[in-house]
């Protein structure tokens, strides 16, 4: 867990997405990046909307579905 709560703003979620997309903690994790960009987009972050769309083009449909499920689960848990 990263300790980020539902009250976080879209910029925090966007930064988490970037971190996962470029692999700051090792290998890039596109599923996690998509999840955080999705959450940031839901908070109105336009750059996250763009990055999420770009990632979607690089991911399999299964990976996109998994990222969306993880975003919904994160919302449900927070």
List each model region and its residues.
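Short helix-capping/linker turns of helical repeat alpha-solenoids
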Residues: 3-16, 22-24, 29, 37, ...
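Terminal, low-structured helical/coil segments at or just beyond the last alpha-helical repeat
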Residues: 3-6, 10, 53-78
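"A position-specific structural signal for the A-helix of alpha-solenoid helical repeats
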Residues: 15, 19, 51-53, 70
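Structural signature of tandem alpha-helical TPR/SEL1-like repeats
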Residues: 27-35, 62-68
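K/E-rich alpha-helical interaction surfaces of small helical-bundle regulatory domains
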Residues: 38-40, 72-73
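Generic structural signal for well-ordered secondary structure
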Residues: 45-48, 60
């Amino acid at each position: 867990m990263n300790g980020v709560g539902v009250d976080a703003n879209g910029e925090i979620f966007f930064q988490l997405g970037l971190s996962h997309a470029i692999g700051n903690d090792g290998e890039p994790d596109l599923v996690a990046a998509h999840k955080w960009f999705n959450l940031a987009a839901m908070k109105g972050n336009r750059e996250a909307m763009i990055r999420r769309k770009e990632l979607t083009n690089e991911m399999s449909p299964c990976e996109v579905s998994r990222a969306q499920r993880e975003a919904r689960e994160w919302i449900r848990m927070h």
